[in-house]
A protein has these predicted regions:
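Predominant activation on well-ordered alpha-helical scaffold segments within soluble catalytic domains
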Residues: 38, 42, 131-139, 159-163, ...
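Glycine-rich adenosine-cofactor-binding loop
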Residues: 131-134, 142-168, 178-183
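NAD(P)-binding Rossmann-fold cofactor-contacting core
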Residues: 168-194
Length: 343
């Protein structure tokens, strides 16, 4: 058989098309600047608000010391994409095994032909895209003159949250709280230096809230700790931690007394802080002002007065993972190892 150079090049091209890029946690952090992620997530919510994408609900599987969450979705951006994320959430990992609380993978596919394009570590990507969603929500739901933030939960997610808020608000100071006081102190030192922001570790949440414009909660708490009586008028709250039915951060009466915007209503009504208020009979799904996508797309209002307490119930949607994964993939072509599953 006579094999020409053209034949060889065609074969090489075919093999390259079959290859899947493998992208590590460090590469995700390097290839996904926070500003890029915020822009991508804002575009994603706009598409959702315009009705151009669809989402299945999340799948949750609970096991002894934690659980697994599966989210998947497709969207037409410059081309058709599909992404699926499997995240493991084991809150006791750092103490028991020296492992991160959240671990997992994102699989990115070409939705025109089904080809697996990339496998990415999900932990850094999840932190970035979740923080980006908070930043997008803050643009529409926080008072524009907000200067003081409080972060409850001082892990990787908490750090990403404060960094993201600093991209969209002119923060002057922040308070940090964590069940582990030493971690809050470390958080305050690191972020004060990194962001040139006055970050103080505190232990008393009600006292911090008396001076807070923006509150972010990113904990695995099973019971509400943000109470209606402690939150002052005009506060914006990003409730990030409750992403399954066994978690809760916001008191039900506070949810009912606030303007609530969610990322995805059917999902938030099942697993977000919203579902606790619904279960208590204090809210109905119809009481939610809007999904964030509708607000971003200009089809619904966000904040309408300085006095409103606004809450973004953030349960996390697959579209956030998809657009973040695409942004990383497009920057990783010549910088990440490849694997051919067809070999």
């Amino acid at each position: 058989v006579h094999v020409t150079e053209v034949d060889i090049n065609v074969y090489k091209c075919y093999i390259q098309k079959m290859e899947t890029i493998l992208i590590s946690r460090g590469q995700v952090a390097e290839l996904l600047p926070l500003d890029v992620c915020i822009d991508a997530v804002e575009t994603a919510f706009r598409l959702l608000g315009e009705g151009k994408v669809a989402h299945p609900s999340t799948l949750g599987v609970h096991v002894g010391n934690g659980g697994f969450h599966v989210k998947a979705g497709a969207a037409a951006l410059d081309r058709e994409w599909f992404a699926a994320k499997i995240n493991a959430n084991f809150p006791r990992n750092p103490v028991r095994f020296g492992l991160p609380t959240i671990q997992g993978l994102v699989a990115l596919f070409d939705a025109e032909n089904g080809r697996p394009l990339a496998l990415l570590d999900s932990s850094e990507l999840t932190a970035l895209r979740t923080a980006a969603a908070t930043a997008v929500a803050a643009k529409h739901l926080a008072r524009p003159d907000s200067t003081t933030a409080t972060v409850v939960g001082c892990g990787r997610q908490g750090k990403a949250q404060l960094r993201a808020l600093g991209r969209v608000l002119r923060l002057g100071r922040a308070f940090a709280l964590d069940a582990d006081g030493a971690r809050a102190q470390s958080f305050a030192r690191d972020l004060t230096s990194e962001l040139s922001l006055d970050v103080t570790a505190v232990e008393d949440l009600p006292s911090a809230l008396s001076e807070t414009d923006v509150l972010v909660t990113c904990t695995p708490s099973p019971t509400a700790f943000v109470r209606r009586k402690d939150v002052r008028p005009g506060t914006f709250i990003a409730a990030v931690g409750a992403d399954d039915e066994g978690k809760q951060e916001i008191e039900e009466s506070l949810m009912a007394a606030s303007v609530v915007v969610v990322d995805l209503l059917p999902q938030a009504a099942l697993i977000g802080d919203l579902h606790h208020a619904i279960a208590r009979g204090l809210m109905r799904a119809e009481d939610v002002r809007a999904e964030l996508g509708a607000v971003v797309a200009g089809r619904a209002q966000g904040r309408t007065s300085r006095e409103e307490i606004t809450i973004f119930d953030s349960t996390g949607i697959a579209l956030q993972d998809l657009v973040a994964a695409v942004a990383v993939y497009e920057r990783a072509q010549d910088r990440a190892p490849r694997f051919n599953f067809g070999d």
